[in-house]
Amino acid sequence: MSDNNPEIESSTFNNLNIDVTESILYHLPIPSLVRFTLVSKQWRSLITSLPPSPSPSPSSPPWLFLFGIHNTSSFHNQSFAFDPLSNTWLRLPPSSSSSDHLVGSNRFLFTTAPRFSFSPILKPNWRFTSPVRFPRINPLLTVFTTLSNSSKLILVGGSSRIGGLVDIEERLAVQIYDPVLDSWELCSPLPADFRSGQDHQTLTSALFKRRFYVFDNYSCFISSFCLDSYTWSDVQTLKPPGLSFAYLNSCNGMLVLGGMCGFSFNLWSIEEGSMEFSEIAVMPEDLLFGLVDSDDEDDKFRSLKCAGSGNLVYVFNDDCHKKFPACVCEIGGGENGICSWRRVPCLPSPVNKFHKVVSFCSTVSITDVFHPEEARIGGSIRG
């Protein structure tokens, strides 16, 4: 935008066809839209009156969210979001929830214990659900769209606590939440091949083609839950040679595994039927060693995390001593698509020390910023 008289520019926008105006604004980075609302009352009215986008814009890649939790003083909690279009970190309001059992997915934060609740990411407004049949901490969680185009939430795995201890014998049932009926449905737990009591510290998941895939880092077992029949597939093994740990993602129409293989961080595309894998990218060495301390022990890479969606895969270190350095890989389209890596800027100072970091990536819509009260579980989510 130019530095001309804002009233003239507003008048110019008003003379445009409404569809053209909306198309232009939908393609702007959200931080730019927020700044433009300060130009004049006309601009603010124009931008805040935009209808919700029916689906994520191709020019709106997923943001990376980091929620730092301090276990003795919520005053030290901090929240950040990285917008790849503007290449900037934004400070967010810290979570107002009293629970530190947070999970993030699909533009929402969720508390899973002692009561289940959810809130839009950008402007906290917590809402409780009906009681969960089997409360749990650290479950796998995502929102999916049903064949009737409604949205539901699925909980898989996690740990239950009895007297502060984990019940290692219990295999928690899958639970599916219907936000319209405010009700939970019980389904079969993870296949018996997966150890009981596992959570997102050992399991990783991805929503892909109407199936919820779960991968176990210890056994390298993988299985998928059909979101139509509510049944589990046969358990298969997924282990590229030399793999030490990995994270499952759904990116660019592919099932993507990202993890450490020896002393390199690789990305593989996964064929969902056979679980055959093919390498699509390797992180440049200078970026990889910029994420860890060179004088660490052999497990120095263990604090690396990976989260991907759309055409981006984020890799970051959730060790507070490193202040959460990160990089991002853009996955090219097509069979011969070129993947490009770049470093993510440092978090804005000051950055506190946290006992727990909740991290995930998600698209962000105009509704999330200007009309969070209208945000709904599953809005603009495509399974």
UniProtKB/Swiss-Prot annotation:
The keyword Repeat applies. Residues 10-66 form the F-box domain. Pfam families: F-box. It comes from Arabidopsis thaliana. SUPFAM superfamilies: F-box domain, Kelch motif. Kelch repeats lie at residues 63-109, 158-205, 253-308. InterPro entries: F-box-like_dom_sf, F-box_dom, Kelch-typ_b-propeller. Keywords: Kelch repeat, Repeat. This is F-box/kelch-repeat protein At3g24760. One of its GO terms (cellular component) is cytoplasm. It comes from the Eukaryota.
